[in-house]
């Protein structure tokens, strides 16, 4: 028979503070809540008699008691508990669990033990035994297991100074594969996106709501509903369970781990329970995340522990999104827990909600955005990037991919910690397709020496727009070897076709390329991520000759042959641009110019790199041969025209236009 903990349902609610309400006001409101929580805690501590505990060694089969929990609003109610026996060594910390049977009108109403009841204190003869924490769905929800209070109180004395990130589910079969999430305030599109992202953490979101009294802090007592929250502010995301024991400003709850992170910085919130939702597997409480009242600083096998009146460390996020079509603007302010594993997901799901709410639609669009990550350590450099994306399917999802990847790479890098203080995002979105195809490009000179400047002109065609040109220069590296040098001209988000062919040839997936990529240190990682090409740039860079598609004699170096192809719909924008070699082996030499469009297409030039003396000699010879070719062509044209019959005016015009076109293509 499989045991399931009474996992605490996640709740998400959207608190409205008024249009344009700044973050400092929210912060002040949180501080007021915390101050009120301290006063409420102190006011109820004085008259309370010391609670007696019942050790497991004194527990006997057949003992009868009761448990406390909330199934509606904030009213604490009770249900009956009968001891069935002791299960040795079955606890998450290696301790014992007490097997119990629950009953009574409340249990009949909820159809058994429900998720969210985790932490419900169990009393026998007035003594606190522990917290209802696990259940057997196969028993109709009437059989559960209690975590002893002695194991839970140890949470107050543990401090290893470590945040362990996310711990995999216990091998003892006590933690289910999924945890229900409750959400309110999210657009339907944002809910779908949230569901996909939370699958990585074995959690499934459901719709919830907010309560009118959520802003009013309430004192905690055994049996109260409490939330361990990961996101607070305009949006709230948290796990709701039950308080087991309170001593002054300290409390323990849940009776099982939330995410088993060890030392934590969750926000502690009150919770209002709307109802208990029936389920085929196990029912769960549906509630809101209320006023912020403290910090949850421990998350371990025996439960969670925290302090009221203490503000946790957090990462703030401000997202400003403007829909250029409707001029609607969405401003979002949230605070998030500083967990390396969760922060990428918490960040992008919040930003996705902001862009989805601003657009009020789903589908194609172009987004232009800038974001900055500010580190907690002011001595470390902030990370700032701008980029542009187009999607024909879901521009909201497309626009947050880069932010997710960058936050993940920086937060989970192998060199050093990079804790963030805040994230700022500014987005402008439109339904207009702002893309351009790179038609061709010309370059001069085609014979160069190390250190020379090459002038490149790219011709681009916007989607349903007029052709335009972009000029840029490229400096030949001073250490460039003599011989052929191949330059790639491409859109900033396009992976050169030769590299894609090599990737397929050796069956190199994006995951493998990411593994073989190396960085010298954190500064190298930080710098190179910031300098990654932008999708709205025309980029010129040296292409590895080992993977070039240009064969000798196929290209005269005067014009790039452009491949008319788009980048993959969901490319990893951090692909290795240096071919199959490790990134750290050589510096990438490139030049780029910004445009107002997402650029597609790429092609290559071949240049001859020679010593200066040989270069000058070759250029003179080339100029002379071009001059001779021009003279010969002029004489031939003159002779042809003299021998021709007189043509009509229209025919003459067509021939002249044809000559002009040929001359232009030959340039």
Residue ranges and their predicted role:
Residues 2, 14-22:
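Short, Lys/Arg-enriched N-terminal segments with co-localized hydrophobic residues
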Residues 6, 20-23, 654:
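Extreme N-termini of proteins with methionine-enriched Sec-type signal peptides or N-terminal signal-anchor
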Residues 10-12:
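Intrinsic disorder/low-complexity segments
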Residues 21-35:
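Bacterial N-terminal signal peptides that target proteins for export
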Residues 32-34, 47, 648:
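Short, intrinsically disordered, low-complexity terminal segments
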Residues 35-45:
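Bacterial N-terminal signal peptides
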Residues 49-667:
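Terminal presequence/propeptide segments associated with secretion/organelle targeting
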């Amino acid at each position: 028979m499989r045991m399931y903990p009474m996992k605490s349902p996640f709740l998400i609610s959207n608190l409205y503070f008024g249009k344009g309400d700044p973050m400092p006001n929210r912060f002040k409101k949180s501080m007021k809540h915390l101050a009120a929580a301290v006063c409420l805690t102190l006011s109820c501590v004085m008259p309370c008699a010391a609670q007696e505990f019942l050790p497991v060694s004194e527990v006997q089969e057949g003992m009868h008691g009761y448990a406390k929990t909330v199934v509606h609003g904030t009213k604490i109610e009770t249900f009956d508990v009968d001891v069935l026996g002791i299960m040795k060594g079955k606890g998450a910390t290696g301790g014992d669990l007490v097997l119990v049977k629950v009953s009574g009108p409340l249990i009949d109403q909820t159809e058994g033990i429900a998720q969210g009841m985790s932490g419900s204190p169990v009393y026998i003869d007035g003594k606190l035994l522990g917290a209802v924490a696990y259940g057997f769905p196969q028993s109709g929800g009437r059989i559960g297991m209690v975590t002893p209070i002695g194991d839970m109180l140890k949470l107050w004395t543990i401090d290893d100074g470590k945040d362990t990130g996310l711990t995999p589910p216990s091998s003892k079969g006590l933690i289910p594969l999924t945890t229900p999430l409750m959400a309110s305030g999210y657009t339907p599109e944002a809910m779908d996106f949230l569901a996909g992202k939370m699958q990585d953490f074995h959690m499934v979101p459901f719709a919830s709501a907010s309560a009118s009294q959520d802003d009013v802090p309430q004192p905690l007592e055994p049996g109260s509903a409490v939330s361990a929250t990961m996101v607070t502010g305009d949006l709230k995301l948290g796990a709701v369970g039950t308080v087991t024991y309170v001593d002054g400003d300290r409390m323990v709850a849940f009776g099982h781990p939330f995410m088993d992170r060890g030392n934590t910085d969750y926000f502690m919130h009150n919770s209002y329970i709307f109802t208990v939702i029936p389920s085929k597997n196990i029912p769960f409480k549906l509630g809101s995340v209320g006023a912020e009242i403290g910090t949850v600083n421990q998350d371990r096998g025996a439960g969670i522990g925290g302090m009221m009146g203490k503000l946790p460390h957090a990462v703030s996020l401000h997202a400003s999104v403007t829909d250029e079509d409707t001029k609607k603007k969405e401003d979002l302010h949230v605070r998030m827990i500083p967990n390396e594993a969760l922060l990428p997901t918490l960040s992008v799901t919040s930003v996705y909600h902001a862009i989805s709410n601003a657009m009020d639609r789903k589908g194609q669009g172009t987004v232009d955005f800038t974001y900055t990550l500010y580190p907690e350590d002011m001595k470390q450099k902030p990370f700032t990037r701008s980029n542009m994306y187009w999607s024909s399917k879901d521009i909201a999802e497309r626009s947050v991919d880069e932010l997710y990847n960058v936050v993940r790479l920086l937060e989970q890098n192998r060199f050093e910690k990079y804790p963030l203080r805040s994230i700022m995002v500014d987005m402008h979105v439109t339904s207009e397709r702002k893309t351009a195809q790179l038609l061709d490009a010309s370059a001069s000179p085609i014979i160069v020496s190390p250190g020379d400047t090459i002038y490149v002109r790219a011709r681009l065609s916007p989607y349903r727009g007029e052709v335009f040109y972009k000029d840029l220069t490229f400096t030949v590296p001073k250490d460039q070897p003599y011989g052929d040098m191949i330059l790639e001209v491409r859109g900033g988000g396009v992976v050169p076709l030769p590299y894609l062919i090599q990737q397929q040839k050796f069956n190199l997936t994006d995951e493998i390329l990411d593994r073989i990529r190396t960085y010298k240190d954190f500064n190298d990682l930080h710098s190179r991520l910031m300098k990654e090409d932008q999708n709205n740039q025309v980029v010129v860079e040296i292409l590895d000759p080992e993977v070039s598609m240009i064969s000798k004699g196929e290209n005269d170096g005067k014009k790039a042959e452009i491949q008319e192809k788009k980048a993959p719909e969901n490319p990893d924008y951090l692909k290795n641009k240096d071919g199959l070699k490790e990134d750290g082996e050589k510096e990438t030499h490139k030049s780029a110019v910004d445009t107002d469009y997402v650029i597609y297409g790429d092609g290559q030039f071949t240049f001859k790199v020679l010593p200066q003396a040989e270069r000058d000699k070759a250029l003179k010879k080339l100029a002379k041969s071009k001059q001779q070719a021009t003279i010969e062509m002029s004489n031939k044209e003159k002779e042809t025209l003299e021998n021709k019959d007189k043509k009509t005016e229209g025919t003459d015009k067509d021939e002249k236009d044809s000559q002009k076109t040929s001359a232009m293509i030959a340039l």
